[in-house]
């Protein structure tokens, strides 16, 4: 058993009678409606809240806080966290606090703590691989935890190699040898691993140029992110999107200023048309999917509803 449950690794281990000292750390970020910079700006200071501004597609993301939470399943975004991001963003980019906030959201870092500390920022972000046969006299179980997105492949390799060693096999992990898809979604063999580049615009100007050149103005589904009906259908057919959230990841549906208030209804109709033809969805299921999608969008909007944001 390989326990790779992230911030939930401690709970999984506890079900096997093993104690792992996890310290889940909540990180809150905000997105503003304008991509004011085209490069990451990071303040050179001791680790603290709000020290990085990242351009992401058509928006800019300011982050992040680091607050310990007792349960990674239940936490709230506090108003002071949003205010802190605005204040720190102003130091990086004058005028940042006057920009329109689109939403706030948070993730939970899977921090592993062996030593005592009151500050989660003092806990290392390096990944940890635990062999519970040696550590806890529980054979047949490994835990891979902590780490960051940039180290996930290395973590997978370390866990797979130890698992093979435990099972007395000489097979080695190949993740460091496998090719990642190129920016256009192709591997060197020409096989697509993601939607074609027409749906992979990072600037609204790129999408606008594509729409104008293809005379697709009358087919706009998401007016904020300039996603057309063709983009939505391509995500469903080529990208094999099964939910509205799948479509969001492909074409940024509902990620603009309206946060899905208009485009989601249109996209739900298109998704229903395509899935009904293959007997995969009923009207009731699409309505539930629509409700769930808008509920998730609303969660991110609520923390930034004050002042001019109303």
Q: What is each PLM-predicted segment?
A:
Residues 5, 186, 195, 280-283:
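Intrinsic disorder/low-complexity detector
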Residues 261-292:
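A contiguous, mid-protein "functional segment" used to position or interact
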Residues 11-14, 19-28, 32-61, 67-259, ...:
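C-terminal catalytic lobe of FAD-dependent flavoproteins
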Residues 281-310:
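Low-complexity, small/polar and acidic-rich linker and loop segments
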Residues 1-8, 155:
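Short hydrophobic core segments
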């Amino acid at each position: 058993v390989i326990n790779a449950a992230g911030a939930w690794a401690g709970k999984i281990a506890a079900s096997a009678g093993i104690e792992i000292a996890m310290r889940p750390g909540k990180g809150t970020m905000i997105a503003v409606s304008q991509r004011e910079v085209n490069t990451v700006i990071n303040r050179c200071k001791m680790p603290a809240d709000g020290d990085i501004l990242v351009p992401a597609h058509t928006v800019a993301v300011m982050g992040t806080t680091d607050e310990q939470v007792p349960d990674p399943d239940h936490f709230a975004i506090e108003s002071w966290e949003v205010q802190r991001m605005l204040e720190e963003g102003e130091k990086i980019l004058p005028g940042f606090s006057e920009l329109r906030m689109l939403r706030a959201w948070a993730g939970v870092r899977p921090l592993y703590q062996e030593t005592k500390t009151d500050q989660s920022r003092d806990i290392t972000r390096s990944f940890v691989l635990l062999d519970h046969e040696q550590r806890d006299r529980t054979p047949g179980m490994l835990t891979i935890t902590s780490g960051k997105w940039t180290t996930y492949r290395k973590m997978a390799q370390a866990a797979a190699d130890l698992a093979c060693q435990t099972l007395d096999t000489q097979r080695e992990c190949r993740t460091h040898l496998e090719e990642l898809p190129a920016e256009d979604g192709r591997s060197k063999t020409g096989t697509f691993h993601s939607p074609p580049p027409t749906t992979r615009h990072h600037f609204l100007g790129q999408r606008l140029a594509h729409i104008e050149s293809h005379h697709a103005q009358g087919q706009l589904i998401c007016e904020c992110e300039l996603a057309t009906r063709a983009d939505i259908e391509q995500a469903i057919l080529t990208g094999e999107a099964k939910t509205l959230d799948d479509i969001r990841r492909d074409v940024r549906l509902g990620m603009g200023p309206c946060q899905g208030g208009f485009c989601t209804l249109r996209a739900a109709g298109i998704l229903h048309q395509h899935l009904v033809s293959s007997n995969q969805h009923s009207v009731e299921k699409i309505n539930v999917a629509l409700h769930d999608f808008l509920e998730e969008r609303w969660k991110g909007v609520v923390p930034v509803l004050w002042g001019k944001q109303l």
